[in-house]
């Protein structure tokens, strides 16, 4: 889990646009965030296995 101060800091609008970055909406992780779902890879995997993300299923070929 991310520190509360870092999550609050990220929600503010930055002085410069290049300073903006994505953060997981569920756990606050700043790295490996899928933009479409606003989740990190770990949270995405957990929710996908539980079937809580509509339209996502395990790949098989």
From Swiss-Prot:
Q: Name one GO cellular component term.
A: small ribosomal subunit
List required co-factors. Zn(2+)
Q: How is the cofactor bound?
A: Binds 1 zinc ion per subunit.
UniProt keyword Zinc, yes or no: yes
> This protein's superkingdom?
Bacteria
Positions annotated to bind Zn(2+): 24, 27, 40, 43
Any matching Pfam family: Ribosomal_S14
Keywords from the named record: Metal-binding, Ribonucleoprotein, Ribosomal protein, RNA-binding, rRNA-binding, Zinc
Which is a GO BP term held by this UniProt record? translation
What are the GO MF terms of this UniProt record? Answer: rRNA binding; structural constituent of ribosome; zinc ion binding
Record flagged with keyword RNA-binding: yes
Q: Which InterPro entries match?
A: Ribosomal_uS14, Ribosomal_uS14_bact, Ribosomal_uS14_CS, Ribosomal_uS14_sf
Instruction: State whether it acts alone or in a complex, and with which partners, per the record.
Output: Part of the 30S ribosomal subunit. Contacts proteins S3 and S10.
Query: What NCBIfam families does the record tag this protein with?
Result: PRK08061.1 (NF005974)
Family of this protein: Belongs to the universal ribosomal protein uS14 family. Zinc-binding uS14 subfamily.
Q: What does this protein do?
A: Binds 16S rRNA, required for the assembly of 30S particles and may also be responsible for determining the conformation of the 16S rRNA at the A site.
Q: What is this protein called?
A: Small ribosomal subunit protein uS14B
